[in-house]
Design a protein with these regions (language model features):
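Local beta-strand N-terminus motif with an aromatic residue
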Residues: 2, 45-46
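Residues at the starts of beta-strands that form the adenosine-phosphate
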Residues: 4, 18, 140
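Conserved class I S-adenosyl-L-methionine
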Residues: 4-11
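Anionic group-transfer/hydrolysis microenvironments
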Residues: 9, 25, 84
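Adenosine-cofactor binding site in Rossmann-like domains, unifying the SAM/SAH pocket
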Residues: 12-42, 145-146, 151, 155-164
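A conserved beta-strand element that flanks and buttresses the S-adenosyl-L-methionine
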Residues: 49
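Short catalytic micro-motifs in class I SAM-dependent methyltransferases
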Residues: 52-56
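S-adenosyl-L-methionine-dependent methyltransferase catalytic module, highlighting the catalytic core
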Residues: 59-172
């Protein structure tokens, strides 16, 4: 039985066969450009994955997105999110472990999209994201380990180590 797995905001990362890639960028593996209006029937999607995507939207927009995505999921379907963790960044900064410059990318997320520069509009910690997910209809909210996924070999920022990708000496 084929699973419908969607990678939202994938950019250049192509997870390969068995994944649908949706992103506003212009890449060969992209099937749709609109993550705000998924072209799937309600209750038809097994997994929606969005790594470092929702922080580019206002919180009010995100609640609408999350509610829409929830309706697309099958019963027992999974929404897997990765966001910059504000509590970790602030703790590491306050501890003096890293300078502010170390966090400017994860905090503000400057990215070029077509002809525009876009930036993060909000930040999350676990509690704020959990409240938002529950308000959007998600019942089971938990953290997940990037090492235990079938996309663990991709640097998609779910492995957001500081310093970047220093898995030996860095911290999440």
């Amino acid at each position: 039985l084929l699973m419908l797995r969607i990678n939202l905001g994938c950019g250049w990362r192509d997870f390969g066969e068995g994944w649908v890639h949706i992103d506003g960028g212009d890449y060969d593996h992209i099937e749709s450009k609109n993550i705000c209006d998924l072209p799937y029937e309600d209750g038809s999607v097994d997994l929606i994955y969005a790594s470092h995507v929702i922080e580019y939207f206002d919180r009010e927009e995100v609640q609408t997105l999350l509610t829409d995505w929830q309706s697309k999921l099958k019963k027992g379907g999974i929404l897997r999110l990765a966001v910059p963790d504000f509590s970790s960044m602030s703790r590491l900064y306050q501890d003096g472990a890293f300078s502010l410059d170390s966090f400017l990318g994860p905090l503000y997320g400057k990215m070029k999209m077509q002809e525009n520069l876009i930036y993060h509009k909000t930040a999350y910690d676990y509690d704020s994201l959990e409240r938002l997910l529950r308000a959007s209809g998600y019942n089971e909210v938990m953290t997940w380990d990037w090492r235990k996924t079938d996309h663990s070999h991709f640097d998609d920022h779910s492995q957001a180590y500081v310093p970047h990708m220093d898995k030996e000496n860095g911290t999440l």
